[in-house]
Amino acid sequence: MGYVRTGILMAVMTALFLGVGALIGGQSGAIIALIVAALMNLFTFWNSDKAVLSMHGAHEVDPRAAPDLHAMVRGLAERAGMPMPRLYLIETDQPNAFATGRNPENAAVAVTRGLLRALSPEEVAGVVAHELAHIKNRDTLLMTVTATFAGAISMLANFAFFFGGGSNQEGERPVGIVGTLALMILAPLAAGLVQMAISRSREYEADRIGAEICGRPLWLASALGKIEGLARRIDNTRAERNPATAHMFIINPLHAMSHDRLFATHPNTANRIAALQAMAGAGVERSSMPRVPRRGPWR
């Protein structure tokens, strides 16, 4: 089902991309947009994980430098019945994390330096389990495709500001000043709405499955509360420069959108915590626990 959802998303985003191209350049613009969209679809499927990791300056963690952290992730992956993902570190003080990759065999989990410093090992395990749930559900390709297309659509809409008011080679005037302004506002908004719909619907499921993987819903609940509070106060510069990837993080990393419920990329954190607390109250815990170091060498 993951590939089916991704295929539908690619079709929707491609149609939106073509529409923007047609409004900017008429028939020629639509043809160019179609070619660009086809290339983007290929690139996104095979290389979008590398692109997103590069956007955030993530570097792969050497198992010898953080053996306990690697052992924790490997143990959680085994409990989830999936391959060990590649592990990346993002050098920012804001605690956060995301997962990416086209399938469980080609996946990566990225955590921030701030996450490893601010959270307890149990809370880190809860966060990693949440990201593994996204990988297991094949949400990662879906979210990465959305981020890539949303960024491209926003960029294309900005081109309309410079080229949308004139005539194209066929003498057509696809959009005037009013149309250009509408395009600049509505195209990124439409892409953003797709992002929000996908992210909100998948976060609750990843919370539920992540809690089952780590065996302790309250570990993740505690982590979410702590990340939410710190993320409001600590900047994530690379995330602010790449807002199209905000929906990939476990908590929205953007300050501008953190208080906007209408355009939130994530469900309300208090509601997520309440759902996890309800799971714990219902006894949804595992008797066997993952190996969690008392004090990781990454701090």
From Swiss-Prot:
<feature type="binding site">
    <location>
        <position position="130"/>
    </location>
    <ligand>
        <name>Zn(2+)</name>
    </ligand>
</feature>
<keyword id="KW-0812">Transmembrane</keyword>
<protein>
    <recommendedName>
        <fullName>Protease HtpX homolog</fullName>
        <ecNumber>3.4.24.-</ecNumber>
    </recommendedName>
</protein>
<dbReference type="GO" id="GO:0006508">
    <property type="term" value="P:proteolysis"/>
</dbReference>
<dbReference type="GO" id="GO:0004222">
    <property type="term" value="F:metalloendopeptidase activity"/>
</dbReference>
<feature type="active site">
    <location>
        <position position="131"/>
    </location>
</feature>
<keyword id="KW-0482">Metalloprotease</keyword>
<keyword id="KW-0472">Membrane</keyword>
<comment type="similarity">
    <text>Belongs to the peptidase M48B family.</text>
</comment>
<feature type="transmembrane region" description="Helical">
    <location>
        <begin position="145"/>
        <end position="165"/>
    </location>
</feature>
<dbReference type="Pfam" id="PF01435">
    <property type="entry name" value="Peptidase_M48"/>
</dbReference>
<keyword id="KW-0479">Metal-binding</keyword>
<feature type="transmembrane region" description="Helical">
    <location>
        <begin position="174"/>
        <end position="194"/>
    </location>
</feature>
<keyword id="KW-0862">Zinc</keyword>
<keyword id="KW-0378">Hydrolase</keyword>
<feature type="transmembrane region" description="Helical">
    <location>
        <begin position="7"/>
        <end position="24"/>
    </location>
</feature>
<feature type="transmembrane region" description="Helical">
    <location>
        <begin position="29"/>
        <end position="46"/>
    </location>
</feature>
<keyword id="KW-0645">Protease</keyword>
<keyword id="KW-1133">Transmembrane helix</keyword>
<dbReference type="GO" id="GO:0005886">
    <property type="term" value="C:plasma membrane"/>
</dbReference>
<dbReference type="InterPro" id="IPR001915">
    <property type="entry name" value="Peptidase_M48"/>
</dbReference>
<keyword id="KW-0997">Cell inner membrane</keyword>
<dbReference type="InterPro" id="IPR050083">
    <property type="entry name" value="HtpX_protease"/>
</dbReference>
<feature type="binding site">
    <location>
        <position position="134"/>
    </location>
    <ligand>
        <name>Zn(2+)</name>
    </ligand>
</feature>
<feature type="binding site">
    <location>
        <position position="203"/>
    </location>
    <ligand>
        <name>Zn(2+)</name>
    </ligand>
</feature>
<keyword id="KW-1003">Cell membrane</keyword>
<dbReference type="InterPro" id="IPR022919">
    <property type="entry name" value="Pept_M48_protease_HtpX"/>
</dbReference>
<dbReference type="GO" id="GO:0008270">
    <property type="term" value="F:zinc ion binding"/>
</dbReference>
